[in-house]
Amino acid sequence: MTATFKAIRNTELPHAFRQVRLELAREPGHPEGDRGIAYVMLAPLDAEGRIDARLWQKHRDACRVVRLRPDVEDERGHLVHRPGGSWAFTYDVAGASPDESGYHFSNERFIPGEYVSIKEADGFHAFRVAAVTAL
């Protein structure tokens, strides 16, 4: 069962919510990175650019992600906070598919030019924070 969404108006969310675009950074097979391999995340960020867990708790349904890949339909999911404090992207609300883990997302700063790691099915990949925009 894939993630389902109800419409949310930007005006219903706190001003801390941002749209964050993460693009694949340079790695073997992608010496220039790849703008087409990306994630677009909607999440509350604190003044330092870190995910605000308190606001996430209050507005968790609004914390969404879209997984972008060339020639593949976009996958829509949610940003989830797991027991122990780790963050992940989940696309399957029934829990049958594995989540994509954000490596140290709780410590990462989501500001343009910074890098974050995401564990996908084939291992960890570095993504560059390409843009952070207010809603």
Residue ranges and their predicted role:
Residues 56-109:
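Short, conserved turn/kink motifs that form compact alpha/beta structural patches or helix kinks used as
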Residues 1-57, 67:
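N-terminal intrinsically disordered, low-complexity, charge/repeat-rich segments that act as generic
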Residues 90-135:
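Short, compact, well-ordered microdomains
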